[in-house]
Amino acid sequence: MLKINFLTIFPKYFDCFLKESIIGKAIERKKISINVIDFREFSENKHKKVDDSVYGGGQGMLLQVQPIAKALKTLKGLKILVSPQGKLFNQEIAKEIVKNHSEITFVSGRYEGFDERILNYIDIELSIGDYILTGGELPSMVMADSIIRLWEDVIKKESYENESFENNLLDYPQYTRPRVFEGFEVPEILLNGNHKEIEKWRKQKQIEKTKINRPDLYERFKNEK
């Protein structure tokens, strides 16, 4: 079973995530378990305060090391700090995590970030992109979703093997009914029943789309051919 812990001061953010179809079903089938932890409960301040002003001056409030460190000491497995300073998360990292870990903790921040000493209790810092969000809860859920999908028997293996980023290529174009909509038609090759030709067309479209939209992936694809 895969165990995922979310450390946050806003636990209600995760309510919908826990009920989402694939994740909710995986929980019901006992393929995964998810634990949302309010690290305010680990504060030694009588008012359960978890933030304070910045030494040396600066804007805003900083999350204190004490409550987060205390919470992390109760947990096992890989401990991830969700941070804009972190390594950029991608499909390869998701695969490595699934391969090597069965318990994962995401620490979500707020305000102006964390006391730097929190890094002494963390295994890796991860980011989902070069932009700033209000807090770490959304990135935590994004990364957890990606990891959960790869866990054994959560979804069929063939369902994700042909998705974007597998083999360093984006997904191919897909169509459903109606055959014609406002003058836009489904490519004829998809209707002729020739599966070899369809497979060849799809691979070509993957390459074309990747070259245009993600030249970095396209270069990796070329180098691995």
From Swiss-Prot:
Signal peptide: none annotated. Its main location: cytoplasm. It is an enzyme of class 2 (transferase). InterPro entries: Alpha/beta_knot_MTases, tRNA_m1G_MeTrfase_C_sf, tRNA_m1G_MeTrfase_TrmD, tRNA_m1G_MTases_N, tRNA_MeTrfase_TRMD/TRM10. The keyword S-adenosyl-L-methionine applies. It catalyses: guanosine(37) in tRNA + S-adenosyl-L-methionine = N(1)-methylguanosine(37) in tRNA + S-adenosyl-L-homocysteine + H(+). Its EC number is 2.1.1.228. It is found in: Cytoplasm. GO terms for biological process: tRNA N1-guanine methylation. GO terms for molecular function: tRNA (guanine(37)-N1)-methyltransferase activity. S-adenosyl-L-methionine binds at residues 109, 128-133. GO terms for cellular component: cytosol. Pfam families: tRNA_m1G_MT. Keywords: Cytoplasm, Methyltransferase, S-adenosyl-L-methionine, Transferase, tRNA processing. Homodimer. Specifically methylates guanosine-37 in various tRNAs. Belongs to the RNA methyltransferase TrmD family. This is tRNA (guanine-N(1)-)-methyltransferase. It comes from Mycoplasmopsis pulmonis (strain UAB CTIP) (Mycoplasma pulmonis).
